[in-house]
């Protein structure tokens, strides 16, 4: 019975995505999505997922293929070094990998393995891990454009920590962009697995805007006042160029030890069902999304 439900769910996402997107919204928020008058950022992301051509979303959400796009736009210097890419976990060439690197899939967000040969590692355990990860992503969260990405494994450079920044993890600068306009930056820090602290900073000048977060989110997290990244001006220029032509996209960058690194382009953050932003801020950000 479980297999049958899985098959039916997958079939519906593939062939009736708008119905399934609306169904998932109702499950998450307890109300129907207003397809005719979407106002918030979340609502407009749902509309775009269901009604727009998301072919480019699929290409640019692929952590391997997006690298060509970044080079085409003139920002190849922001890419981490790519050590290899494989279709099968058994084909990972551990002998050719450097002492430290990152292994992850190109299509998901939970497969990351930090490889440090100096500390020893279980090769077979890593292979089995990636065998489990090489499955289509996006069906459970009803994000159809992810389901079209061919799952692969990649090995890339480990971005160094910047010890001058007060964070237990790399600070992930997430820029919310609307067709060339960079609206804000959400610096995320003190990451533990998939959990992290995310703030809101407005730009030009860089200034905190926690009013855009829900009261529940503010009360359940310990915040730090993150200074503007040293290379903020160039980061914003990168975001302007990369986001042009897209109604909305979140562009993730790192600024560490004097260098900018590209992270990813995300077109439906949290499936377009984000809960950390207040209703008012959701509507403000949504007002910048021009639907085709």
Predicted segments, located by residue:
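Phosphate-binding site of ATP-dependent enzymes
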Residues: 97, 124-216
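Short catalytic/ligand-binding loop motif for oxyanion handling, primarily in non-cytosolic enzymes
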Residues: 67, 90-93, 109-114, 122-123, ...
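A long amphipathic alpha-helix within ATP-dependent nucleotide-binding catalytic cores
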Residues: 148-154, 163, 199-260
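Coil-to-beta-strand transition motifs
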Residues: 77, 168, 177-183, 244-248, ...
């Amino acid at each position: 019975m479980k297999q049958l439900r899985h098959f039916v769910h997958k079939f519906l996402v593939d062939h009736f995505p708008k119905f399934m997107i609306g169904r998932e919204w109702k499950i998450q928020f307890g109300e129907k999505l207003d397809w005719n008058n979407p106002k918030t950022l979340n609502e407009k992301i749902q509309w775009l997922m269901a009604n727009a051509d998301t072919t480019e979303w699929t290409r640019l959400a692929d952590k391997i293929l997006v690298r060509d796009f970044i080079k085409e736009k003139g920002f190849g210097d922001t890419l981490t070094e790519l050590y290899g890419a494989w279709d099968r976990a058994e084909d990972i060439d551990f002998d050719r990998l450097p002492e430290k690197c990152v292994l992850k899939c190109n299509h998901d967000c939970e497969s990351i393995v930090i490889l440090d040969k100096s500390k020893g590692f279980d090769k077979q355990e890593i292979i089995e891990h990636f065998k489990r990860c090489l499955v289509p992503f996006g069906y459970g969260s009803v994000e159809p454009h992810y389901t079209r990405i061919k799952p692969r494994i990649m090995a890339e450079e480990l971005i160094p920590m910047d010890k001058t920044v007060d964070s237990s993890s790399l600070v992930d600068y997430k820029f919310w962009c609307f067709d060339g306009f960079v609206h804000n930056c959400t610096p995320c820090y003190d990451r533990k697995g998939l959990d992290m602290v995310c703030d809101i900073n407005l730009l030009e000048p860089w200034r905190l805007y926690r009013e855009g977060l829900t009261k529940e989110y503010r009360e359940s997290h310990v915040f730090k006042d993150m200074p503007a990244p040293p290379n903020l001006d160039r980061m914003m220029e990168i975001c302007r160029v990369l986001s042009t032509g897209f109604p909305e996209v979140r562009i993730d960058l790192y600024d560490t030890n004097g260098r900018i690194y590209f992270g990813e382009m995300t077109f439906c953050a949290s499936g377009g069902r984000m809960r950390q932003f207040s209703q008012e801020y959701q509507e403000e950000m949504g007002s910048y999304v021009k639907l085709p």
